[in-house]
UniProtKB/Swiss-Prot annotation:
Gene Ontology, cellular component aspect: cytoplasm
Function: Catalyzes the dehydration of methylthioribulose-1-phosphate (MTRu-1-P) into 2,3-diketo-5-methylthiopentyl-1-phosphate (DK-MTP-1-P).
Cofactor binding note of this UniProt entry: Binds 1 zinc ion per subunit.
Gene this protein is translated from: mtnB
InterPro entries for the chain: Aldolase_II/adducin_N, Aldolase_II/adducin_N_sf, MethylthioRu-1-P_deHdtase_MtnB
Cofactors (names): Zn(2+)
Protein name stated in the entry: Methylthioribulose-1-phosphate dehydratase
Length: 205
């Protein structure tokens, strides 16, 4: 896929995310890998539902350097960390949905475990509802390098798959392509909504 095709796919994903209401008030950030050295990421403070091609900035994956001198998303370091750690990741989507934000606070443990849902099969490699899918949860931190270090420490002993939550903040998810990242995002959002509803109903029982 050419750079223009990748950007077109990411723009479409951003507009779809905006329509879903998963990135209100200019929140969130999205990126796509161009090659081993560079990615494109959303500029800071842009509404995701109305992004244009010029709202994406070229970033050097190894250093987070932005040749244009413009300001990328504050969380650029988490995107580039994922690209450095896993060469198969081709796109990263970070959203601020209500379900992901609330569930990340309701769950007090270090992981959100999803089990028994048919839609787990929307995640690459998952073939049955009987498996347990663990989504790590990291405490929020305005110090992005410190947060990235905690993600790195986790990934040193447990593979990062599909995505992770930042408590009270939102979801990071990814895929080999923008298309796969979109599917993972939609699948996880459905699963989060189911899990949140299940917990609410059980609490009332």
């Amino acid at each position: 896929m050419t750079e223009n095709q990748q950007l077109t796919a990411l723009l479409a994903a951003c507009h779809w995310i905006g329509e879903k209401g998963w990135c209100p008030a200019t929140g969130g950030n999205m990126s796509v890998r161009l090659d081993d050295a560079q990615c494109l990421i959303t500029e800071s403070g842009k509404d995701k539902g109305s992004l244009q091609a010029e709202d994406f900035l070229l970033v050097e994956i190894a250093t987070n350097h932005v040749p244009s001198g413009r300001t990328p998303s504050a969380e650029t370091g988490l995107h580039t960390l994922l690209y450095r750690r896993e060469p198969t990741i081709g796109a990263v989507l970070h959203t601020h949905s209500v379900n992901a934000t609330v569930l990340s606070r309701v769950e007090k443990g270090a992981e959100l475990v999803l089990h028994g849902y048919e839609m787990q099969k929307s995640l690459a490699g998952q073939t049955t509802h009987l498996d347990r899918v663990a989504i790590p949860i990291f405490d929020n931190d305005q110090d992005i390098p410190a947060l990235a270090q905690r993600v790195t420490e986790y990934a040193s002993h447990t593979p990062l798959r599909y995505g992770f939550l930042v408590r009270g903040h939102g979801l990071y998810c990814w895929g080999a392509t923008v298309k796969e990242a979109r599917r993972h995002l939609e699948g996880l959002e459905f699963l989060f909504q189911c899990e949140l509803q299940r917990r609410l109903l059980e609490a009332k029982a």
